[in-house]
């Protein structure tokens, strides 16, 4: 057993001993299928703390032929698969964390030299009887070992993209690094499988990837590996039940990453949760912001303040709960090459700050935890209109509960005045105004939009969450160049809308009218029992 060659199972054993361990071992079924085939090159990209390193440790423990690890896997799901015994402890494993080597070196060249020397040292120590043709050449050393053992390598590279995050501007260093990986891995018989994980997909130059032999599984196209990184909804439900925590709250805080797996018969959508956040919430018995503690909101701030091509407007709309159309095809898979706002939004998907809907090609903010990071970032930027509006949404909600019609009208008016994109030219803009003005209402309500296209009004229904049933339900109808009485009448004629069909209790009917000539808002509120 070496430091990098056949490193053992200590890390994975630690995962199994943890208070919370969610079995993702069926990932091994997929990697077993790829062994020694044209599909043996796999690259998985996910945000921080989504279980990438744990999965790499699991694969190392499973394939490492220097130890018998059956005791670690015999109770896991993989043990029931027909490929389990066939591949258990059958390969030489090389496992490296590129961030470790980068942290120990001053330049990219020094990092690669150190990596090659350390791997060669492990190989020579493990196989002293092998006659090495060139002890300084990593590729030749691995060829010599493979010729001697007839046992190919499973190569696991964690944090493969760290150089692109640390050397953002150094294109030459990036290119040399990719050239090294290609020379080391591509078309090599000694590779049974090359498995890389990172945050970014593989860097593209022009229309081509330097590592085009890899099959990529990313946040925008997770493929058949969708369910193995992050916690699925059934897994989170089981943890909430075990730790006596509210599943509804867990969903509000951490759900929202919709990863679609394309199958022969249908598309299967996996609702994924951040594992770090869910585990911390269960163990602390408190819902809060945990995933984002891995890096401050400054990381998000850097990108959303690049107000190119309407980026600020898109962020404001997403804060209001809307989705924004996006073209992910122009993204260069790095952190500096941005031609349009779509490239920045695509990067935010890979970083975990947005979720991508492959069906309608839109992005949105996934959950409360991530939304709070946007609020934190905006509060320190020059977006004063947005920051002030979010801050004052507390008072607007209290005014609504107090039936203060003038204060509610003033709050909606403030949103309309201070945010340039909120022009009343369609139903989406109407609802965006209401959602942003009542941003804080999400603490208490599920907010549902009903937008009859072309009718000149927008319905917003606020249904109290289970733990806030003491609050009234709310229906808001915003119209332009009509009147508030007509708005209230229309709510009643529609029997409160579809969203409140099953609701019983107190309902606030809120009619808001905008007069285009006076540019003033009027508000009328009625209290009803349903």
Question: Locations of the language-model features?
Answer:
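Short secondary-structure junctions
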Residues: 438-446, 502-504
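Structural motif
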Residues: 154, 472-476, 508
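Mg2+/Mn2+-dependent nuclease catalytic core
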Residues: 174-179, 480-497
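Active-site metal-binding core of divalent-cation-utilizing nuclease and nuclease-like domains
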Residues: 144-149, 442-469
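Phosphate-binding site recognition
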Residues: 1-426, 441-444
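Conserved catalytic cores of phosphodiester-cleaving nucleases, focusing on short active-site segments
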Residues: 434, 458-462, 471-482, 494
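Domain-level recognition of nuclease-like catalytic cores that cleave nucleotide substrates
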Residues: 499, 503-530
């Amino acid at each position: 057993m070496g430091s990098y060659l056949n490193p053992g199972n200590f890390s994975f054993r630690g995962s199994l001993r943890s208070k919370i361990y969610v079995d993702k071992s069926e990932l091994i079924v997929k990697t077993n299928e790829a062994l020694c085939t044209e599909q043996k090159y796999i690259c998985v990209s996910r945000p921080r703390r989504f279980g990438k390193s744990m999965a790499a440790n699991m694969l190392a423990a499973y394939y490492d032929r220097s130890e018998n690890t059956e005791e670690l896997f015999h109770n896991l799901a993989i043990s029931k698969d027909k490929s389990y015994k066939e591949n258990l402890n059958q390969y030489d494993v090389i496992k490296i964390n590129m961030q470790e080597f980068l942290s120990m070196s001053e330049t990219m060249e020094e990092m690669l030299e150190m990596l090659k020397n350390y791997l060669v040292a492990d190989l020579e120590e493990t196989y002293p009887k092998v006659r090495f043709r060139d002890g300084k050449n990593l590729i030749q050393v691995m060829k010599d070992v493979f010729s001697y053992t007839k046992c190919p390598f499973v190569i696991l590279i964690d944090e493969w993209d760290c150089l692109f995050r640390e050397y953002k501007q150094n294109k030459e260093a990036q290119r040399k690094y990719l050239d090294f990986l290609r020379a080391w891995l591509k078309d090599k018989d000694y590779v049974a499988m090359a498995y890389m994980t990172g945050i970014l997909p593989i860097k593209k130059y022009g229309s081509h990837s330097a590592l085009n032999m890899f099959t990529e599984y990313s946040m925008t196209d997770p493929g058949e590996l969708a369910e193995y990184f992050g916690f699925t909804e059934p897994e989170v439900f089981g943890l909430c039940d075990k730790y006596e925590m509210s599943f509804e709250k867990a969903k509000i805080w951490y759900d929202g990453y919709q990863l679609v797996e394309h199958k022969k018969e249908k598309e299967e959508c996996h609702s994924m949760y951040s594992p770090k956040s869910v585990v911390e919430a269960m163990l602390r018995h408190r819902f809060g912001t945990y995933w984002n503690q891995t890096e401050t909101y400054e990381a998000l701030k850097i990108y959303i303040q690049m107000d190119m091509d309407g980026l600020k407007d898109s962020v404001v709309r997403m804060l209001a709960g809307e989705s924004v159309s996006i073209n992910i095809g122009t993204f260069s898979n790095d952190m500096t090459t941005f031609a349009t706002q779509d490239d920045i939004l695509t990067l935010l998907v890979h970083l975990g700050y947005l979720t991508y809907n492959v069906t309608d090609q839109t992005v949105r903010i996934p959950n409360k935890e991530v939304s709070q990071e946007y609020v934190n970032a905006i509060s320190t930027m020059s977006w004063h209109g947005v920051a002030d509006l979010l801050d004052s949404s507390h008072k607007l909600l209290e005014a609504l509960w107090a039936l203060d019609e003038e204060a509610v009208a003033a709050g909606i008016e403030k949103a309309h005045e201070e945010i340039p994109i909120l022009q009343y030219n369609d139903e989406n803009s109407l609802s965006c105004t209401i959602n942003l003005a009542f941003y804080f209402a999400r603490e208490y309500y599920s907010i549902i939009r009903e937008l009859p296209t072309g009718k000149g009004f927008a319905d917003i229904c606020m249904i109290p969450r289970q733990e806030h049933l003491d609050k009234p339900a709310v229906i808001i109808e915003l119209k332009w160049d009509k009147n508030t009485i007509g708005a209230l009448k229309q709510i009643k004629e529609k029997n409160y809308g579809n969203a409140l069909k099953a609701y019983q209790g107190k309902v606030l009917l809120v009619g808001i009218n905008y007069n285009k000539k006076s540019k003033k808002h009027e508000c009328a509120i009625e209290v009803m029992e349903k």
